[in-house]
Amino acid sequence: LRILLAHNSLYYPSYGGGDKSNRLLMEALAAMGHSVRVVARVEQFGGEAHTALVRELTGRGVRLDAHGSASVEFRLNGVEVRILTRDAGLRAYFTAQVQAFDPAIILASTDDPAHLMLEIALRAPRARVVYLVRATIALPFGPDSGLASAFQTEALRQADGVVAVSEYVARYTQQWGGVTAIHIPISLLDPGAHPDLGRFDNRFISMVNPCAVKGISIFLALAERFPSVEFAAVPTWGTTAADFTALRKRPNVAVLPPVDDIDDLLRQTRVMLVPSLWAEARSRMILEAMSRGIPVMASDVGGLAEAKLGVDYLLPVNPAVRYWPMVDELMVPMAEIPPQDLQPWAAVLGRLLTDRAHYEQLSAESRRMALAYARNLDVRPFEAYLCEVLRLPRRRAAAGRRIPRAPLSDERRRLLALRLKRAKQHVGD
């Protein structure tokens, strides 16, 4: 199959969970013998971004096929990658790529919340369009949407297939959007060994992407409750300047840079905290940590229960249910964060810090369940789904529908995409 991913984000190198999940999915499809191309973009267009990306890629040993015009082209683990860098005309660039590559399948996803690329994909004369839902906040409907839109909802209904990262997301999509979605595993683990890194004497209680909606308030409160314990925060797309200030005020909190190899963080981690306060679609961090024997304390919201695989601990929170009509300086929608009851979290963490036998039992159970899940986690069910989609008539042709156009200029659509793109879950993981 000729498969084209419309990726309205950087793709590589990137530390976002959704970006990483899309990359591993494309590489797995390429390893199955399919011809796979990705069209992506830098965060901010221009000559400086172009030069910085070229420098970063060459420093990582990536051989560039082309980098002299408006984009950077290279092959990564069997996947053709085209990243637009200098020119803000993403829609025109993607249109040209669709015409040149002539894919049988176009994959779009919630990393394109304003549907800048989905609308073009739906107009492709031959390709089937499959939409990957990795984040409820980037859907155009429902209580967890960052931007409700009847136009975008109608466009999504014309996709030939919709695949959700969790059963929770599949139910949400059906309930609030009237869009039939199927849950198929689309967040694969890195190939290769998953070392046993869980140690009672490891240094840190860790959290990735500390910010308001991810539960930085719980993280900081735990650091205050346990002043003699070392905590580690790894800021990524959601951590604001105010969050950095709050983290640095705590003498027992180390602020660490994000890493390419998650094992570099996990081998220092005693317990992983995932105290999210919004409706997480899923979390690849939970599975990555558990597969290495790291106990995970996660909040009981969204699809996190599925990610925990029935293993302790899933803890109560007061979730954010109201979003303000504004974004922070990182363009993340701002939520009203309710007060939290720290006691359940403090009780569990206290036990994991003092009861070695319990820690080691939970570490072993976490690893056993995660590796059992991972043994059956591969791209073949998704590949079979794509083949099934190809056997059916194109949905928009069968329905005789016109592709809706939202009444927005390209400039406003780009702004809306920018306002939401950092809020996707990887999401999401």
Locate each region found by the language model.
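N-terminal subdomain of nucleotide-sugar transferases
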Residues: 1-60, 224
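Active-site proximal beta-strand in glycosyltransferases
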Residues: 105-107, 120-140
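Membrane-proximal helix-turn-helix segments that form the acceptor-binding/catalytic region
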Residues: 145-161
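Donor nucleotide-sugar binding/catalytic pocket of nucleotide-sugar-dependent glycosyltransferases
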Residues: 157-193, 199-201, 213
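Conserved catalytic-core segment of nucleotide-activated headgroup transferases in glycan assembly
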Residues: 190-251, 255
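Acidic donor-binding loop of glycosyltransferase active sites
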Residues: 267-281, 294
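Short hydrophobic beta-strand element within catalytic cores of glycosyltransferases
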Residues: 295-298, 308, 314-316
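A charged, aromatic-enriched C-terminal amphipathic alpha-helix characteristic of glycosyltransferases
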Residues: 336-347, 353-384
